[in-house]
Regions:
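C-terminal structural segment of proteins
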Residues: 1-309
């Protein structure tokens, strides 16, 4: 199908884009990668009166690090993160593990991280990473700029704190400490489907004891969530040598954390190919496995750097 008739504007500066978004009398959508927007327009699920194409605003196509913070501009494509050295330290490794799960190469070449946050699909890898890693979303309008913590930005499936007059110009992630181990595992029906469940982990261990952990859950509720209850069960736990991902003893801290995440943190929404009980089971299993992956990564980093465990 063809989309309904709409007006098109391609500004060259952020102020021009903001002026267009300030016209509250029109239904307006912002176009960056367009990998979700264009499809929905073709299917007549959304009918914007004006499409503001920001691809000519070159200042938005920037990736920078300052003050231990990564800033990702609104036009930075998914594929920019496929190589782990694109971002310093363990954060780059985590991003590279996550991004390969996003659709396929042509979509990763056009779609953007910030576009994923704007769309706010519960199965988005980037959205869960933003919540788990305490990212901030930068929102501009004609009156100025505001920062919204990712944990407060997502309001539900496809709903966010962004106002119609605002443009997301960037998202900011704190860098992870060099001795942080990371893991990301995704389960989906076929390779190009949305995630049925996915888990992201960042883990720090000192002398065999877990001192810090972050667990992000993808498609485990109507919005991306951080598994705070599961994280609390891990602080102070002794893990010894990481178990094999597929052979985790039931009494191991990683297995217990998975059960807590499934029972207390997650609020799954049933889908055609994944009911609530199925998702809870998958969450429990994947949290344990991803923690194993992160622990092995942490051990590798510490051994390589010669640090004490």
């Amino acid at each position: 199908m063809k989309p309904a008739t709409f007006d098109y504007l391609a500004p060259h500066t952020v102020p021009e884009a903001l002026d267009a978004l300030a016209d509250s009398g029109r239904k307006t959508r912002v176009l960056a990668g367009g990998q979700s927007l264009i499809l929905e327009m073709h299917l007549h699920r959304i009918h914007p009166e004006l499409v503001v194409d920001i691809n000519r605003i070159t200042e938005l196509d920037t990736l920078s690090v300052a003050d231990h913070t990564l800033r990702v501009g609104a036009l930075v494509r998914h594929r920019a993160f496929e190589q782990e050295h694109a971002v310093p330290g363990p954060l780059g490794s985590l991003f590279s593990r996550a991004v390969v799960n996003i659709a396929h190469p042509p979509i990763r070449a056009r779609g953007t991280m910030v576009g994923s946050l704007a769309w706010a699909h519960p199965a988005s890898e980037w959205c869960a990473l933003a919540v788990a890693l305490d990212a901030d979303v930068e929102l501009h309008d004609t009156n100025g700029v505001r920062q919204v913590a990712a944990r407060d930005y997502f309001r539900g499936a496809m709903r966010t704190a962004r106002r119609p007059c605002e443009l997301i110009t960037s998202v900011r992630f704190p860098l992870l400490d060099d001795d942080t181990g990371v893991g990301f595992i995704e389960h989906r029906r076929t390779h190009f489907c949305f995630a049925q469940v996915a888990v992201a982990v960042a883990l720090t261990v000192r002398d065999g004891v877990i001192t810090k952990t972050r667990i992000g859950l993808v498609n485990a509720a109507d919005r991306p969530i951080r598994a705070h209850a599961a994280e609390q069960t891990l602080i102070g736990a002794e893990i010894g040598a990481p178990p094999a991902e597929y052979r985790i003893p039931e009494d191991h801290p990683f297995a217990r954390a998975g059960q807590v995440a499934a029972e207390y943190d997650a609020a799954p929404v049933a889908e055609s190919y994944a009911g609530v009980d199925y998702k809870r089971h998958a969450i429990a299993i994947l949290v344990g496995r991803t923690l194993c992956q992160a622990a092995a990564d942490e051990r590798s980093r510490t051994t390589t750097s010669g640090g004490a465990r």
